[in-house]
Each structure stands twice: as structure tokens, then as C-alpha cells.
Regions:
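Compositionally biased terminal segments of proteins
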Residues: 1-196
Length: 196
């Protein structure tokens, strides 16, 4: 299917129309945007915002107000006004009936103009402008190396399939950056030989 006609991405665009801060499509949909086609079916769409912008998220998304979900267990609870959420353990989700695919908001750590990998103890970072790619119609999405930095620690078969499907689209600079990050955090990881 053509990425241009995706109802899911149109729903994200409409949902974030009034959101004044940075956001990115992440996960498998970001890879689809980079490849220019829908490569496989998706169960949901991940949208990442900066954790420092949580107050703006609360002001923008009020009807309906999203719920807090634990991505590991799927358990949901109401999001209390003023409650702070950290990168990693929580996501915000909207009622499934509102969109073609469930949309979840994930949080990224940052430091001034840099994105910070929250699993890397602050040592893995990249300028926000470098991690931001845009579709032909302007939809922001994470660069490949950022998507795979999160996917490589999951060990899921769909993540391995995603990697095999788009690894040849990497340019050398992004490839080397990802290699260095994986080698630093997980020196025995199975994707490393692909880079060598």
C-alpha cells in the first residue's frame, strides 16, 4: 500500500495538528516512511514527544484525555492532571475506537538541543535536528538509527525482519553511529556482523 494513503498516518497528523512542540513517528511506521511504502501490518503507531513538553501534551490532548498505559503489561489507568511521566515505563494511549490503529505517545529524554537515549545512562545522544526526518508532506519521523537503537534490544522476530528489510537503506554515517551504540551497549548483539 502507498504510504501517502495511510489512514493511520492521516489520523496522527490530525491528532497532532494543534500540538506546538516537536514530535516524531517512531517504530515500524517510521521505517515505512523512510522506505516510502507500507512494508508490513502494524498493530499500533508510536508517536514520540519530549518528556520536557509533558505540560504541553496535557494542554493539547484534552478531549478525550489519554490514559497512562504500561507498555509491558498493557494495564491502563487515568492520567492525573499534573502527573509527570518519565521516558520508558509509560505511554499515553487514546481510546482504540477513535483511530484506525491505536496511537500511543511515548516520551523521549532530552538535554537542551539533544535527544538522549534513556536506556544509555545519558551517554548516547544526538542533536534533535539530526534525528528528525520528514516525509514528502512534512510528517516528522525518527531517523533509522534511532528506531533501530530501540528495536535492537527487543529481540522480537518482527524487529529482526524490519532490520533485514531496510538495512541496505542506511547511509554510512548513520550506520556507523548505530554500530558504535550497539557495540557499546550490547557487544554480543546479533546485528553487529551485518555492519562489519
Amino acid at each position: 500500500m502507498s504510504i501517502d494513503r495511510s489512514e493511520t498516518l492521516s489520523a496522527v497528523r490530525a491528532l497532532f495538528h494543534d500540538y506546538p512542540c516537536r514530535y516524531w513517528i517512531a517504530g515500524g511506521w517510521a521505517l515505512d516512511l523512510f522506505a516510502g511504502r507500507v512494508r508490513r501490518q502494524h498493530g499500533d503507531v508510536d508517536v514520540v514527544v519530549l518528556a520536557r513538553d509533558l505540560d504541553e501534551v496535557a494542554r493539547t490532548f484534552t478531549r478525550p484525555r489519554p490514559a497512562v498505559q504500561n507498555p509491558e503489561t498493557g494495564e491502563c489507568r487515568p492520567w492525573a492532571p499534573g502527573e509527570q511521566l518519565a521516558p520508558g515505563p509509560n505511554a499515553l494511549v487514546f481510546p482504540d475506537s477513535l483511530h484506525p490503529h491505536p496511537i500511543q505517545i511515548l516520551f523521549a529524554a532530552s538535554d537542551a538541543g539533544e535527544w538522549v537515549y534513556h536506556r544509555g545512562r545519558g551517554t548516547i545522544r544526538k542533536p534533535l535536528d539530526e534525528i528528525t526526518l520528514r516525509s514528502p508532506d512534512g510528517l516528522p519521523y525518527f531517523a533509522l538509527e534511532i528506531v533501530f537503537l530501540f528495536k535492537f534490544c527487543g529481540g522480537r522476530s518482527k524487529d529482526n525482519d524490519d532490520f533485514a528489510d531496510v538495512v541496505e537503506l542506511f547511509d554510512s554515517e548513520r550506520c556507523c553511529w548505530l554500530f558504535d551504540c550497539i557495540a557499546l551497549c550490547y557487544p554480543e548483539y546479533s546485528w553487529l556482523p551485518v555492519f562489519c
